């Protein structure tokens, strides 16, 4: 299952790879890839740990982006099709 999400479909020039938006996009694609791997290999615990680490890093980046640029955050979660953060 090779489902990749495109960030640069209609957003104009390509963003730099160090930007927060690109890092979240890249982590999301890795999460999708690793999730499909874990559906076939459910006892691959080292991959599960890697998935949890990726999800934690993506969450921290989303928190940072939501605090600094809420419009970009909302656009990004809509493009990627991921849930927003829980507000406390």
UniProtKB/Swiss-Prot annotation:
Keywords: Chloroplast, Plastid, Ribonucleoprotein, Ribosomal protein
GO cellular component, one term: ribosome
GO molecular function: structural constituent of ribosome
GO annotation terms (biological process): translation
Keyword set includes Chloroplast: yes
InterPro entries referenced in this protein's UniProt entry, alphabetically: Ribosomal_uS15 (IPR000589), Ribosomal_uS15_bac-type (IPR005290), uS15_NS1_RNA-bd_sf (IPR009068)
One protein family per Pfam: Ribosomal_S15
Keyword Ribosomal protein: yes
Domain of life: Eukaryota
Subcellular location(s) per record: Plastid, Chloroplast
HAMAP family xref list: Ribosomal_uS15_B (MF_01343_B)
Subunit annotation: Part of the 30S ribosomal subunit.
PANTHER family: RIBOSOMAL PROTEIN S15, BACTERIAL AND ORGANELLAR (PTHR23321), SMALL RIBOSOMAL SUBUNIT PROTEIN US15M (PTHR23321:SF26)
Family assignment from sequence similarity: Belongs to the universal ribosomal protein uS15 family.
Name of the protein described by the UniProt record: Small ribosomal subunit protein uS15c
Organism: Angiopteris evecta
């Amino acid at each position: 299952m090779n489902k990749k999400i495109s960030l640069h479909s209609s957003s104009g020039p390509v963003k730099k790879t160090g930007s927060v938006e690109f890092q979240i996009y890249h982590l999301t694609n890795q999460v999708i890839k690793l999730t499909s791997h874990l559906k076939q290999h459910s006892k691959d615990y080292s991959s599960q740990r890697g998935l949890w680490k990726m999800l934690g890093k993506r969450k921290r980046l989303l928190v940072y982006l939501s605090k600094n640029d809420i419009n970009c955050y909302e656009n990004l979660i809509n493009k990627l099709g991921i849930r927003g953060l829980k507000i406390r």
